[in-house]
Curated annotation (Swiss-Prot):
MF (Gene Ontology): acyl-L-homoserine-lactone lactonohydrolase activity; arylesterase activity; metal ion binding; protein homodimerization activity
Alphabetical list of SUPFAM superfamilies matching this protein: Calcium-dependent phosphotriesterase
Coiled-coil region: none
Reactions catalysed: a phenyl acetate + H2O = a phenol + acetate + H(+); an N-acyl-L-homoserine lactone + H2O = an N-acyl-L-homoserine + H(+)
Enzyme class: hydrolase
Domain of life: Eukaryota
Cofactor: Ca(2+)
Record membrane topology: Peripheral membrane protein
Classification of source organism: Eukaryota, Metazoa, Chordata, Craniata, Vertebrata
GO cellular component: extracellular region; plasma membrane
Protein's job: Capable of hydrolyzing lactones and a number of aromatic carboxylic acid esters.
Chain's gene name: Pon2
Protein name: Serum paraoxonase/arylesterase 2
Length: 354
């Protein structure tokens, strides 16, 4: 009798694992192939060889790139090279990427930047918020951008128990931000288990010096985050659910879900065109190829443009798709004055004139 019970439990366990495995492949879009959608006036950005996971652009055309991300299970073309922040002036006739110097005293050897966000204060001070993963932990670094010196002055490191696995960030004040946790756990094995079992424990946290609180939860894997030009709505990408969540910002900074836009791809970082409110999205057509890297079958790249997301029928346009022959693993797409920048998790970055 005991053996029968044991065999029954083993069978149930194996069936559950098999079902979860198939579900994970579906969430990763592991069987998806793509056909190219090309743009005519594009070139790879010189000096970016280890990815530009996130990009943020100031109103004056200065673009910041988060480069060199390394993560457990993620491919890297330069595993021993620290990450950094690069800058490009999009108003230049021939813009080029330059690495920003970081103030003395900041640990550059362990700098592992992920999501970034800028904030301009009332006195025109520019703050750069950077999600950092030193030793694969999660911190938020706040820098002051010193334009005359092309440098970053480190102001503060933020750690908090509600920020265990930060992916992206949107600054809403000089020391205030919303952040996505792509996992509930910080331990790599528990993160993998959480993803495999599809627990939907990822969340969004609001941080200020006075208050830190959970403001949205129930995501499969909360990823990119951004805010509408009028600051009324926060957008969150759920990468493994292939969704963008629209949340209304309340006076107390809580978030109330308004709608969910379903997409047929893995949505990563979200960028907002300040003039139109359009959302530009860096996407992964096949997520499995990001983690099981093979040079003959590299991860593809995809850029979507979403117009009128608050309407009953938002317009979703595929702007660019490449099978990985040029650009591998697009994670962000952002626009400035008809100039499109597309960054990747760990490969290169693309500059296009539309």
């Amino acid at each position: 009798m005991g053996r029968m019970v044991a065999l029954s439990l083993l069978g149930i366990g194996l069936a559950l694992l098999g079902e979860r495995f198939l579900a994970l492949r579906s969430r990763l879009k592991a069987s998806r192939e793509v056909e190219s959608v090309d743009l005519p006036n594009c070139h790879l950005i010189k000096g970016i060889e280890t990815g530009a996971e996130d990009i943020d652009i100031l109103p004056n055309g200065l673009a910041f790139f988060s480069v060199g991300l390394k993560f457990p299970g993620l491919h890297s073309f330069a595993p021993d090279k620290p990450g950094g922040i690069l800058m490009m002036d999009l108003k230049d006739e021939r813009p080029r990427a330059l690495e920003l110097r970081v103030s003395w005293g900041f640990d550059l050897a362990s700098f592992n930047p992920h999501g970034i966000s800028t904030f301009i204060d009332d006195d025109d001070t520019v703050y750069l918020f950077v999600v950092n993963h030193p030793q694969f932990k999660s911190t938020v670094e706040i820098f002051k951008f010193q334009e005359e010196e092309n440098s970053l002055l480190h102001l503060k490191t933020i750690k908090h128990e509600l920020l265990p696995s930060v992916n992206d960030i949107i600054a809403v004040g000089p020391t205030h931000f919303y952040a996505t946790n792509d996992h509930y756990f910080s331990d790599p094995f528990l993160k993998y288990l959480e993803t495999y079992l599809n627990l939907h424990w990822a969340n969004v946290v609001y941080y200020s010096p006075e208050e830190v609180k959970l403001v949205a939860e129930g995501f499969d894997s909360a990823n990119g985050i951004n805010i509408s030009p009028d600051k009324k709505y926060v957008y969150v990408a759920d990468i493994l659910a292939h969704e963008i969540h629209v949340l209304e910002k309340q006076p107390n900074m809580n978030l109330t879900q308004l709608k969910v836009l379903q997409l047929g791809t893995l949505v990563d970082n979200l960028s907002i065109d300040p003039s139109s409110g359009d959302i530009w999205v860096g996407c992964h057509p096949n997520g499995q190829r990001l983690f099981v890297y093979h040079p003959n079958h590299p991860p593809a790249s995809e850029v979507l443009r979403i117009q009128n997301i608050l309407s009953e029928k938002p317009s979703v346009t595929t702007v660019y798709i490449n099978n990985g022959s040029v650009l591998q693993g697009s994670s962000v797409a952002t626009i400035y004055d008809r100039k499109l920048l597309v960054g990747t998790l760990y490969q290169k970055a693309l500059y296009c004139e539309l």
